[in-house]
Amino acid sequence: MSFWTSTIICVLLFQTVEPQPVRIDKDWNINQAYVDVFKILSTQNTCSDFYGGPRRATTVLNSFVIRVKTQSLLREVSFQMEGSVTIFHDPTTGAVYRLFEKTAVNIHGSFYQRRADPMRKFPSDVGNFAPGSRAARALILLHELGHLIQGEDGTWLLPDDGNDDRRSSANTIRVQSVCRAQLEKLK
């Protein structure tokens, strides 16, 4: 076999390898949300397309989810990423993405807490989904993933929320709109 032939075979094999779920040592809620999101992103659909396709999306998800820690934050906050940022370029997928030094999910927020009394404001819904539901947890992870992946135009798929509740809500609605069909199946 010539060098040229072996190179082509290696490239083709390398490109067809699908990312596999990583084993994470997290609590049940994070594990379930991760598995749900991995399943959503591992097939070709409008949701995975938003994140650059199944290979790119699941590669970044795997790098991201292992960093997630639980923390007590203000109840209005579901998730927080802060600290120094590291930029990654994955040559096999072409993904350019960033990971933050600190990545925390709020134990008192909408990821974990359900609203016992429908008349209460907190924990708040996540998009159109009830707090603490499978769909809400998956939407939270998908929202955060959108802040990490750089689009073809060089900007992040979702602009940083900062402390802007309106921008955060708009980002959540944007993700929900492209992932609605997949999220609805989690109810």
What are these regions (language model features)?
Residues C10-A138, L148-K187:
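Predominantly extracellular/secreted Zn2+-dependent metalloproteases
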Residues M1-I9:
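Sec-dependent signal peptide recognition
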Residues E144:
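Walker B catalytic acidic pair
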